Structures are given as C-alpha cells and as structure tokens.
C-alpha cells in the first residue's frame, strides 16, 4: 500500500545558519573597485539563506517527496492531457542559446530564436489546417480570449456590431463561457442530445442575426467526437457566425483530422497539453491561436515573418486590423522550444501513433471499468482520448460521492481524475490516461476503482474519510475559505495563537 512521505519541513530561510556556504566565487584576476551610486544602493541587508549545497538538495528533495507529478505515476486529469514531458525538451530549453537571450535584443542577433518560432508556426499550420498563427497567448484561456476577441473585432469591422451572442455547447471545455463573457458576449448554451453530441435542432433554433460564433471542443469533454461537425459548421456559417475550435482535446485526433478541414475558422492550442510541455505550478503555458486567411489581419502583433530573398527572420508589425497585444513581448519562448523539440522528435507518424494509443488507452480503461457497481457510463460507449463515468448510483446507494472516490484513489498512490466536470454528468469522474501510461498502469487504476466500489458498498466510512496515506489529509474546504493560510509566517502565527491545530 502506498504511503506518502511527510516531513515537518521548515522554510529554507529558517534552515539558514550564518557562515554556511553553498557556492564560492572565484577570486578576481585583478582588484576591482566598483562604486555603486548611493540612490540605488541597498539600505538593508540582503536577506538570503545561508546553507551548504547538501542541505539545499535535501530540503528540496523532501519537499518533492510530499508532492506528485507526471513523473511519479498515472495522472489522468480529464481535459488536461497530463502526458509525460520528455527530458530532451528540458535540455534544449536550458541551452545557452535559449536561456541567455533577451527579448529586447536586436532581431539580427536572435535569428535562431525567430527561426524556432517560425518553424513551430509551420508545424501548427500543417497539423490544424489553419493559415496563420500567433504564438503570443500565454495559455489556453488566454488563447480563447484572443480568439473570441478576433471574432468580436471581425464582426464590428464588417458592420455587424449586433452579433453579440456566443453559442457554447454544454459539453464544451470549461473556460469557454468565461472567455466569451470577458470579451463582451452573451453566452447561449446549446444542449447535448442523448448521444452526448450537439443537438442540431437546438443549434438551428439558437442561431440568428445576433450569432457571433460557436465555440466547440471536438472531441467534446465527454470524450465523444462530434460526428456531425460538417453540418454544425454549415449551420453556423449560414447564420453569419464563425466556428471556433477549442484545442483542449486535440491529442485525440492528431494526424487523423484537422480542425481547418472540419470547417473551423479559428483554433487555439495548448502546447502544455498536446505537445508535452509542462503544466507545472500554473505555468508557464502557451496557447497559440491559428486562423484562416480571412482573419489573419486581426492577429496580435508582432507576428514572425520570413524574408526568403535575404534568408532573414523578422518581427512583423504590419497587421492592419490587429486586436493588439494579449501578452507582453512575444509569448513564452522556452515553452515554444520544448514543443518544437517534441514535434521534431515525434514526426508526423509519431504524432499520429500517439493519438491512436491515447484513444486506445481511454477505451481500454472504459471497457474494463464498465459494469462495475456504482459507476455508469453516459452517452455513446465509444470514446476518444478520455472517458467520463458517473458515480451517481454509488452516491444514491451508499452516500459515497465522486469526491470521496477521488480522495480514496490517492491512498493507492494514484492521482485522482477530474471530478464534477463536465457539469452535464452528475457525480462525474473524468479520466484521461493519455498515451504515455502502460497497460499495467491502466489495469492498476481500474482495480483501484473497483476496490473503492467494493469498499463503498461494504465499509463506506473508509472511503468517506479518505485519504489516509497522504502527507496532507482531507482539506477542510469551508475553513480554507473562512480562514485561509497562504504563507508559512501566517501558519506559524495562527498556530501560536491556537487558532489552528495541525
């Protein structure tokens, strides 16, 4: 049975002891006299921790043992594509030619960096069937906001400012409604049919002269491919709207079908999902946005251009109707490097194979879990890259919720799936294994879910009180809001006052 390490680990500043040294600088060849102007000289002591290298390594190793990541084991968060991040990506991102350049350098001195951005754009254009990309957005939601801002500007530019409604299916990626609302649109929800795909009749009834566009995730968040996508595109375009592709689930269809060929006008991608760059710590991510030719003049500036005659890459600010910047400078460059390395290592056939295995893994897990007491599968049984089970029968019969199941999974040394999403599935367990887990890991995950089912019906309190073997037990969600402890100093002060007892 898994048991996570738990260390009573102080802050690195608290471990500091005066006089301890982790690194020494070489002596200068000659005496240097540097006079720092008074107005920029520090008034107080530079408070940096003083530790030896072994102490630093032990400190961060202990912290890592109380954590869990994609290198620890299966991490099947649905709609997140938590695949393994190849370490060659990190090697290339740490290359001095990447790590030590500055965005303010003259473009003549960063031709290699601009070439990387140019090549990445060519790959993304080919993969998606789009005509031009901006690499500026910092993440998926930032990409969504960029895309819907382009839609808004396009309609205003065409003399149709009344198009203020954005259609969003109830099975779309979760951030779509928020991004549309932030861009000033009224969000109209389109329901799913009994198969888990867009209800065409409802869509036809919803479109009109106020329709700006439809934001669609395909496959959707149930893991089901929208097989009537061509008809959906026809309905939206006939009404004068644009079709927006949320690339959250692109990992399911690489090399199989392209958004541009399905009728989409705009697409955003997540390099930190499909193209194996890290999700770590909330960023940095990257959410490139691609458009068809008729929308390229609305993209954020600058774009990266290539002068074939002079074999020179350059920053192109000649984008007449640009929506402006959506992030400072040019985007998260080191993330782009990682993604391009992944693309070049995998190649066309490798990407296609990755999607096939991702779909195979999701369907294998679905079939193995199907029929287990307490879990039911809504919609079509054939999935793409992810699957969504409902634990509603278990909740009704035992009182054990989807959240309880997720917490209990932690006791087996496995990361929980996404829970309570999509909202159209009650007590949802959204599982996306990705292509980088083995059959043995899938088998173990299913066995853990089956064992939790047995426990729910024989000894439900074991599940309801989980996790038992983690460094941190179940968090009090209510108290976390009422009395947040967001720093170590705050924790020590509250503990000294007796206001917390952990």
Curated annotation (Swiss-Prot):
This is Probable glycine dehydrogenase (decarboxylating) subunit 2. It holds the Pfam family GDC-P. Belongs to the GcvP family. C-terminal subunit subfamily. The modification N6-(pyridoxal phosphate)lysine is found at residue 273. The lineage of its organism: Archaea, Methanobacteriati, Methanobacteriota, Thermococci, Thermococcales. One of its GO terms (cellular component) is cytosol. It comes from the Archaea. NCBIfam families: PRK04366.1. It catalyses: N(6)-[(R)-lipoyl]-L-lysyl-[glycine-cleavage complex H protein] + glycine + H(+) = N(6)-[(R)-S(8)-aminomethyldihydrolipoyl]-L-lysyl-[glycine-cleavage complex H protein] + CO2. The glycine cleavage system catalyzes the degradation of glycine. The P protein binds the alpha-amino group of glycine through its pyridoxal phosphate cofactor; CO(2) is released and the remaining methylamine moiety is then transferred to the lipoamide cofactor of the H protein.
